[in-house]
From Swiss-Prot:
Family: Belongs to the annexin family.
Organism of derivation: Gossypium hirsutum
Cellular component, GO annotation: cytoplasm; exocytic vesicle; membrane; plasma membrane
Binding-site list for Ca(2+) 3: V295, T298, E303
Keywords assigned by UniProt, alphabetized: Annexin, Calcium, Calcium/phospholipid-binding, Membrane, Metal-binding, Repeat
Protein name: Annexin Gh1
Major place of residence: membrane
Length: 315
């Protein structure tokens, strides 16, 4: 994780008082908001929201929404949410968008632990009064539907135990299906959607040793095929999440005009998880530190909070 929380944190009521102060008077004190929320973990932020509502009779998110704008507002609001609520919100937005939405749904389904995904589904129920599964079922079609529905519905085994005989059998099965271009075959999807990450890793290692190619190389038959691209991303998310997120960041930062949506999503969903590993991968791949790339591509309070969440320490 890259989030830094001070060893001694002020009391929750003090944090709330300071936030209230940041909203009062002429203009908003964005620096104060960054100093407080940018250095509190999920549990602390939840407590701040609860206490703020009890003390001032107003939802902190509504107060922030009124005071802030643009990319900075989006980053603060997403960051202030509980991780499960945030995933529910991102997933719900994804079911309403036609572009890149499949990727966001797959990312949430494959890079969260079994319990995190379960909590996201529960948060979805609470927030939208329906299930994530029914929205995904309703908004996706064809092969995308076939892959995404079992992915968002899954509850994978999390242990390290691996069945090597099964890994061998399923590597052979995957190789046969892929050789026959049966990419959306039930068996391919079953393996990716139900097996534990450790088991999938063993299967894919066996695949490479036995058939000479990384599975994602064999899934590159048609670079323009969007389903194949999603399948490759699924494999990456399950086995090398840091490589997947590095690529999302690289594409977000390197395009003409930054994709702030993707940059915001990755930084605020991974800052408490593995953003350090992702940043190391980014530097290895691009020979530039992630924080420097952020400085070059963003500005103002948005840039400041991104840097704080990415663990940047000002000298």
């Amino acid at each position: 994780a890259t989030l830094t929380v001070p060893t001694t944190v002020p009391s929750v009521s003090e944090d709330c008082e300071q936030l209230r102060k940041a909203f009062s008077g002429w203009g908003t004190n964005e620096g104060l908001i960054i100093d407080i929320l940018g250095h509190r973990n999920a549990e602390q932020r939840n407590l701040i929201r609860k206490t703020y509502a009890e003390t001032y009779g107003e939802d902190l998110l509504k107060a922030l929404d009124k005071e802030l704008s643009n990319d900075f507002e989006r980053l603060v609001l997403l960051w202030a949410l509980d991780p499960a609520e945030r995933d529910a919100l991102l997933a719900n937005e994804a079911t309403k968008r036609w572009t890149s939405s499949n990727q966001v749904l797959m990312e949430i389904a494959c890079t969260r632990s079994a319990n995190q995904l379960l909590h996201a589904r529960q948060a979805y129920h609470a927030r939208y009064k329906k299930s994530l599964e029914e929205d995904v079922a309703h908004h996706t079609t064809g092969d995308f539907h076939k892959l995404l529905l079992p992915l968002v519905s899954s509850y994978r085994y999390e242990g390290e135990e691996v069945n090597m005989t099964l890994a061998k059998t399923e590597a052979k099965l995957l190789h046969e299906k892929i050789s026959n271009k049966a990419y959306s075959d039930d068996d391919v999807i079953r393996v990716l959607a139900t097996r534990s990450k450790a088991q999938i890793n063993a299967t894919l290692n066996h695949y490479k040793n036995e058939y000479g190619n990384d599975i994602n190389k064999d899934l590159k038959a048609d670079p323009k095929d969007e389903f194949l691209a999603l399948l490759r991303s699924t494999v990456k998310c399950l086995v090398y999440p840091e490589k997947y997120f590095e690529k999302v960041l690289r594409l977000a930062i390197n395009r003409r005009g930054t994709d702030e949506g993707a940059l915001t999503r990755v930084v605020c969903t991974r800052a408490e998880v593995d953003l350090k590993v992702i940043a190391d991968e980014y530097q290895r791949r691009n020979s530039v530190p992630l924080t420097r790339a952020i400085v070059k591509d963003t500005h103002g309070d948005y840039e400041k909070l991104l840097l704080v969440l990415a663990g940047h320490v000002e000298n």
